[in-house]
Every structure is written in C-alpha cells, then in structure tokens.
Swiss-Prot record:
It comes from Salinispora tropica (strain ATCC BAA-916 / DSM 44818 / JCM 13857 / NBRC 105044 / CNB-440). It holds the Pfam family RF-1. The modification N5-methylglutamine is found at Q251. Belongs to the prokaryotic/mitochondrial release factor family. Keywords: Cytoplasm, Methylation, Protein biosynthesis. This is Peptide chain release factor 2. GO terms for cellular component: cytoplasm. HAMAP family: Rel_fac_2. The lineage of its organism: Bacteria, Bacillati, Actinomycetota, Actinomycetes, Micromonosporales.
C-alpha cells in the first residue's frame, strides 16, 4: 500500500472514531464521572452497601469508557505523526510500522463501535444470567457448569464484578442450573445475544465405553430490574419454600434451612437462591431474580403485541445458537453469525468477545431488516 492509501485509511478511522465519540457522548460521560466521583466521596456512602457497590461499579465503568476513547484518540494521532515521518524520510521500515499500527487501530475502533449498537430499552442495564442443563444427562449438567465458568471468566477478563445467586448441583457431576449477575452498565445489551440453546459434542468422560455424546444447555439473559420498573409482586401471588442448601452430589452444605424457593402462582415461574449465608439474603436475591423474569415476560408480551404474534414462553430460551465440538474435530461455531474458531479451550476460558461482537452486529442487522420489511 502507498502513503496515500494509509492516509485515506486513517481519515476513515478518524471519522469512525468521531462518530463513536458522538454516539457515546463523551461530554455526558465526563459529566457522569464528576457526578459519580462526588457520590463516591460522600462520607455516608457505605451506610447503604447496595448503593455503594452500584456507585463504584458505575464509576469504574465510566472511567473505563473515557480511558478507552482517550487511548484510541491518542493512538490515532500518533499514527498520523508516524505516517508524516515515514513520508518525509521515505523510510520503508517506518511505513511497515504504520501498517501494523493502522491494522491494530482498525481492530480496536471496530470493537469500540459495537458499543454504539446497544440502544435497546434495557441495553444499559446490568445482566442476570441463568444457565440450565438440558438433554444429555450428566454430560448436560457438566456442560452447564462449563458454561458458568466460561461466562465468569469472560467477566473476570474484563474486570466486571459478578455475583452468583444460585447453583443447583446435579447428583453425579455438574449443575442442574445456575444464576448470576454481571454488575456493570450495558452488561444486558452485551450478553443478551448469548441467550439460546448451546450444544456440546465430545467423547463423554462419564461413559465407560468412551462414546461420543451430544448434550445441551440453555442460557437466558435478563435485564436487572430497577426501581423505575415498578415490578411489585403481591405477597398472595407468591409461595415461599425453604430448604437446606446442597452441594455437589446432593450433599447438604448447611445445617439450617437457608435456601429459598419462590413460586409465582399466576405464571408458574419458579426461582431459587441458596448461595447467600442467610435465609433473608437468599429471599432478597430470589425476589430480584423473580422480578427480572416478570420484567422479561412483560417485555415479550409487549413485543408480541406490537408484532401481532402470540407470546411463546419457551421461546425465551431461543433456538440452538452455538455448537462446541470437541470430537471428532475441535471447533466452536455460532449458527446465526457463522463466527467460528478452532480453539474451544480458549472459548471455555472466557475468550468470547469475537462471538459476542458478531452477535450484536447480527442482531442489529436483523432489527434493521425487520424495520424495513
């Protein structure tokens, strides 16, 4: 490529970055930072721990967004200077350096651009993620546990705080179900593309004959309920049951009935929570999960009404959306976006960004197609 080609690429990247800065509203982010820093410095902040955690989490996120934009702007300016030097000195080595920096910038700006696609009503919310073992017996339960670790590792890689509300262990190995939250703004908009049925193909470590086994697990991503949602549930619409928390193999891990199960009588929705130390804490966590499920149900009903369709409760789990194949070859493939990789071990260790970004772009394309239909 010529100097002029690189100059044109940098011009395009500059325009894209300016658009990102405009959509994300850098001035608003700075104002949010000042407001949150003031709240974080209040002497009585930690009198309300939930509020304190929310403020510190939001401040960390806003600082991260501002720093990412500043870093991209700085790198872009440096690349322009580097290109000018390469042109002035006619130095092929410097031009090679420009090529590498332009390629890296294009990738980083492309990743940042994905954030501008999160404009749904609840996209800015924290996320509540539920994982449930499907068909496949003990392999499905093991797969559910693998998915839980995958998402927690993804959050850890990004420095996102998480809280596991519930883990229901299967008798032999793995999990029947698990529920956790990702406590950072836009977690719902980001992770909601992970909702659906996940499929694992491998040689079963639980089969004495070493046969290949296909198993399934469902992932459901919900927006965390906020006070403005006004999701009030009358006491007479709920049935509360308490029991002892259980660990792997069905072993009791508590000597008191601290685990809580709530059944919402009108809808039949059941939620459980057993990871907190006290029954009161588990009840509060279970109520938050129930509120999130009812909010999602309300959202689906409103969407169905707009589309003139009938709500399908099972549809919240979505169709089969990703396959993880460990035998006879190694591949993870998203069936909607065609995004794939030959390194499933890395994916299970939380390297999900490429799949999530492709999913967000795919969803936006689907929305635009529906709007134009």
């Amino acid at each position: 490529m010529t100097d002029a080609d690189y100059a044109e690429q940098l011009k395009d990247l500059d325009a894209t970055l300016r658009n990102i800065e405009s959509v994300l509203d850098i001035d608003r982010l700075r104002a949010d930072k000042a407001r949150l820093e003031e709240a974080a410095s209040a002497p009585d902040l930690w009198d309300d721990q939930a509020r304190a955690q929310q403020v510190t989490s939001q401040l960390s996120y806003v600082n991260g967004e501002i720093n990412k934009l500043a870093e991209l702007r700085s790198r872009l300016d440096d690349a322009k200077v580097l290109l000018e030097l390469a042109e002035a000195e006619s130095d092929p080595g410097a031009l090679t350096e420009v090529e590498a920096e332009v390629a890296g910038l294009a990738k980083a700006i492309d990743e940042m651009e994905v954030r501008t696609l999160l404009s749904g009503e609840y996209d800015s919310r924290e996320a509540l993620v539920a994982i449930r073992a499907g068909a496949g017996g003990v392999d499905a339960a093991d797969f559910a546990e693998m998915l839980l670790r995958m998402y927690l590792r993804w959050a850890e890689r990004h420095g996102y705080p998480t809280e596991v509300y519930e883990t229901s262990y299967a008798e032999e190995a793995g999990l029947k179900s698990a529920t956790f939250t990702v406590k950072v703004p836009y977690a719902y908009g980001t992770l909601s593309v992970e909702s659906g049925t996940h499929r694992l193909v491998r040689i079963s470590p639980f089969d004495n004959q070493g046969r290949r086994q296909t198993s399934f697990a469902g992932v459901e991503v919900l927006p965390v309920v906020e006070q403005t949602d006004h999701i009030d549930i009358p006491e007479n619409e709920m049935r509360f049951d308490v029991y002892r928390s259980s660990g792997p193999g069905g072993q009791s891990v508590n000597t008191t009935d601290s685990a809580v199960r709530i059944t919402h009588i009108p809808t039949g929705i059941v939620v459980t929570c057993q990871n907190e130390k006290s029954q009161l804490q588990n009840k509060a966590s279970a109520l938050r999960v129930l509120q999130a499920r009812l909010l999602e149900r309300k959202r689906q009903e409103e969407q169905a009404k707009l589309q003139g369709l009938k709500t399908d409760a099972a549809g919240s789990w979505g169709d089969q959306m990703r396959s993880y194949v460990l035998h006879p070859y190694q591949m993870v493939k998203d069936l909607r976006t065609e995004q794939e990789t030959g390194t499933p071990a890395a994916v299970f260790d939380g390297e999900l960004d490429a799949f999530i970004e492709a999913g967000i772009r795919w969803r936006k394309q689907q929305q635009l197609a529906d709007d134009n239909a």
